C-alpha cells in the first residue's frame, strides 16, 4: 500500500494538467489562497501519515521526512517532464513510469526491510536475555550501545 500510494500520485498528477498548473501557481505565487490550498492538501493526508509514523517510529524511521521527499520528487518529475529527461529517464513515456514504479518499489523494500530488521533484532535480544547472555555481550554481538539496548528492551 505504501508504494502504491506514491505510484497513484505519480499517475494521477501525470494525467491532471489542472493540478499541475495549481502546483506551479502555488510555487510561484505565495498568498493566503495558495497557502490554504497547499495546507489543505497536507491535512488531507494526515491520517495516513500518522498511521505510517506510528508504524515506523519504533525503528527510528522518519517516515514523514521520507514521504515529503518522495512527494516533492514526484511533483518535480511531473512538472519537469515536458522540459527534459531527468537522469536520462523520459517520464512522459510508459518506460519512464515503469522506471518510477521500480524505484518506488526498491525504496519501499529498503524501508520495510529496516523495520523488519528492527523487529528481528528486538526478538533476538530478548531471546539472548532469556538465555542468560549478559547485556555487555549482547551489545558486543549486536553492535549496539547500552542506551540502544535499553531502548529496544523498553518497547
Question: What residue spans do the PLM features occupy?
Answer:
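Amphipathic alpha-helical packing segments from all-alpha helical-bundle domains
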Residues: 4, 11, 15, 22-24, ...
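Hydrophobic/aromatic-rich alpha-helical bundle segments in the mid-to-C-terminal region
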Residues: 42, 52-107, 111, 115
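Short, amphipathic alpha-helical "recognition" segments used to contact nucleic acids or chromatin
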Residues: 117-133
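Intrinsically disordered, low-complexity regulatory regions
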Residues: 123, 154-155
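DNA major-groove recognition helix of helix-turn-helix
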Residues: 129, 142, 153-154
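The alpha-helix within a helix-turn-helix
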Residues: 139
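Key DNA-contact positions within bacterial/archaeal DNA-binding proteins
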Residues: 147
Amino acid at each position: 500500500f505504501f508504494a502504491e500510494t506514491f505510484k497513484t500520485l505519480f499517475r494521477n498528477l501525470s494525467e491532471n494538467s489542472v493540478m499541475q498548473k495549481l502546483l506551479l501557481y502555488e510555487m510561484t505565487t505565495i498568498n493566503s489562497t495558495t497557502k490554504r490550498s497547499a495546507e489543505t492538501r497536507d491535512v488531507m493526508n494526515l491520517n495516513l501519515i500518522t498511521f505510517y509514523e506510528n508504524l515506523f517510529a519504533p525503528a527510528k524511521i522518519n517516515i514523514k521526512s521520507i514521504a515529503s521527499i518522495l512527494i516533492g520528487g514526484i511533483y518535480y518529475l511531473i512538472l519537469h517532464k515536458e522540459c527534459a529527461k531527468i537522469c536520462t529517464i523520459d517520464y512522459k513515456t510508459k518506460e519512464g513510469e515503469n522506471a518510477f514504479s521500480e524505484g518506488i518499489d526498491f525504496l519501499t523494500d529498503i524501508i520495510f526491510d529496516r523495520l523488519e530488521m528492527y523487529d528481528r533484532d528486538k526478538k533476538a535480544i530478548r531471546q539472548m536475555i532469556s538465555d542468560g547472555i549478559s547485556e555487555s555481550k549482547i551489545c558486543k554481538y549486536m553492535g549496539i550501545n547500552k542506551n540502544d539496548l535499553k531502548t529496544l528492551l523498553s518497547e
